[in-house]
């Protein structure tokens, strides 16, 4: 029997799981995914933590302890999420060691309410880096205009960064420049480049969701272009990756021991039930990439994914033709990606607010029970 996930790994794609929970950690499920499903990393976000904390009783003891200490909700949130991420870092540490720090990484996101505040994002990133205190940690920072200098500064301080919420190739170019800037400054500061790493999380399925919604309003022949924008956009991002990491600026950094910032495909579950559930995995295969998936997508690839080798390089002309055709139809690419960035931040802010409200209720309940 073939193993599509093994084939995906052999094609140069690092498979990460886009989920975390104390249940997954305590039952050994994450360790099993590493052992049996070729998973070599973990990503998290406020929505994932919200579902985990609301849906499990395994957080109650820590919540009671936090209530006794009288901490506020922000400190409680930081403690709860850092605990899980630190645990996940320990589970993935053998992968980190075996791959010389390339994989075995776990990501934790800064408070999304700080997405447009550079200095606050830097301060939060430092706090999380110190709190989790694991070499295989990534701090997730959104690729907003205000996030770009924060990304560079964190890297300059030796903090490994997962740049999130990238939707456009133009913003991706800016992210790579911020990465170069940060690594150059890290070298000047004498940081250990063997420990410093970064990935750039390029969001995929949401692009199709937004573009397809606009195509449906146009109707007619425009509908033939549905479900094509996201893969084309990601393929052109990989072309940018190849171009930027072939420049003399990068070659000078690589000569000093720097590692490239890998493209990471995020938002890879299909939102349209009419599409193949492995679409954003099998169509985005190329060496040196990461694909982070919810467990449902991971299992779908394992069950019936067809890995055809490299499905990115060699498709650049087709990808550009797709975006050109969409522009001819009146699809404003910049407006699409600006909308997605704004909505992406808003969604994570909303999830964080909901999570904070749930934790507040839990803290108050624990305090009432203690007072009886």
Curated annotation (Swiss-Prot):
Gene3D superfamilies referenced in this protein's UniProt entry, alphabetically: Aldolase class I
Keyword set, alphabetical order: Cytoplasm, Pentose shunt, Schiff base, Transferase
GO cellular component labels: cytoplasm
Protein name: Transaldolase
Superkingdom field: Bacteria
Localization annotation: Cytoplasm
GO BP term, pick one: carbohydrate metabolic process
Family: Belongs to the transaldolase family. Type 2 subfamily.
Pathway: Carbohydrate degradation; pentose phosphate pathway; D-glyceraldehyde 3-phosphate and beta-D-fructose 6-phosphate from D-ribose 5-phosphate and D-xylulose 5-phosphate (non-oxidative stage): step 2/3
Enzyme Commission numbers on file: 2.2.1.2
Organism: Acidothermus cellulolyticus (strain ATCC 43068 / DSM 8971 / 11B)
InterPro entries associated with the record: Aldolase_TIM, TAL/FSA, Transaldolase_2, Transaldolase_AS
Reactions catalysed according to its record: D-sedoheptulose 7-phosphate + D-glyceraldehyde 3-phosphate = D-erythrose 4-phosphate + beta-D-fructose 6-phosphate
Entries under NCBIfam families matching the protein: PRK03343.1 (NF002881), tal_mycobact (TIGR00876)
Functional summary from the UniProt entry: Transaldolase is important for the balance of metabolites in the pentose-phosphate pathway.
